Every structure is written in structure tokens, then in C-alpha cells.
């Protein structure tokens, strides 16, 4: 039993996601599957919490069954918590301009259901091309939509200030989305992003 194993390591969260990459047309034809997905997450959340004291977290992914603000709020209505990946959220709900506040606004509205954060950022250049229809979902350039934390549309100093104001005391992880990087390149990116968050005093 997975939850028993998690308990043995004093783990309090179980991360889940639907993990289905698709285009809007495909998604529109999957309403029944989406309903079943909500039901599954709701049942899983109640069971793990009531039986083991483990909180099920839903990690939203862009181009999946649950990615928009409305879709995530339906999860929250089921009393589920979210692993809030600000990059995936902004890439699905925000625009391409520097200082886009979509992720900050959602975080502020639903902080009581967000104990866990993934730090990411979105390339404004790639996002703009996507929104203007210049990139197909399978265009290789879409693999570069996530960028280094200091280079994207999310203002991390504003994000830091919001977390301070909300007195966030949960977990935060720098997550790398660089599918074509070598191990060494990914490691260098991780060090760069860590140094940036330390420089702006988001972390120590």
C-alpha cells in the first residue's frame, strides 16, 4: 500500500496529475473523461486523508484535462489541495507580457488550498507566438516555453512579496523543464535558479 509506505517515511503529501497532453479540440471531446477524473481525484483525496492523514495534491499541467482557473477551482470545491506550479498555470491562463499576474492572483485567492509550490517561469517570446497561432502544439519550440526564473513573464520579486504577505509556510521546489538539456546543463540551470532566488531573498 503506497500510503503506508509514505507514512513510514513521515510523508504528508501524495502528488498526483492527469498528465495528458492534448490540444483544445481533443480536450473538448473528453467531457465525460474529465468528469470521471474529478470523481477519481475527489475519492482519492478523501480516502487518503481520512484513512492515512495524507493530503492528495493535484499538480496542474498545461494542455491537460485540468488546467484553467475554472477547472482548478472545481477541484478546490472538492476540498482538494493543489501543488501550484506557477509556470504551468501562467502558460495555460496568462498572457505573454512581463509582469503577468495570473499565477499571483490565483495563489492569493486560494492560498488555503496551496501548501506546496513549484517555482517555474514562462518565456514571453514563446507564449506570444503560441497565443498568436504561430506555433502548433507539437512545434519543437514549444519545448522551450519554460525558461529560467529571472527571464520569464512572472515577476518573482512580486511573487516573493506576495508569499511574505500571505505568510506562506509550505514547501517550495525549483522545478526544471528543459527536456533537451544534458545532465550538466540541467544542473547549471538549477544552480542559476537557486542563486537567483537567494539573491532576491525568496529563499535563504
Place the predicted regions along the sequence by residue.
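Active-site acidic/histidine proton-transfer and metal-coordination neighborhood
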Residues: 1-84, 91
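Histidine-acidic metal/acid-base catalytic patches
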Residues: 4, 10, 50, 69-204
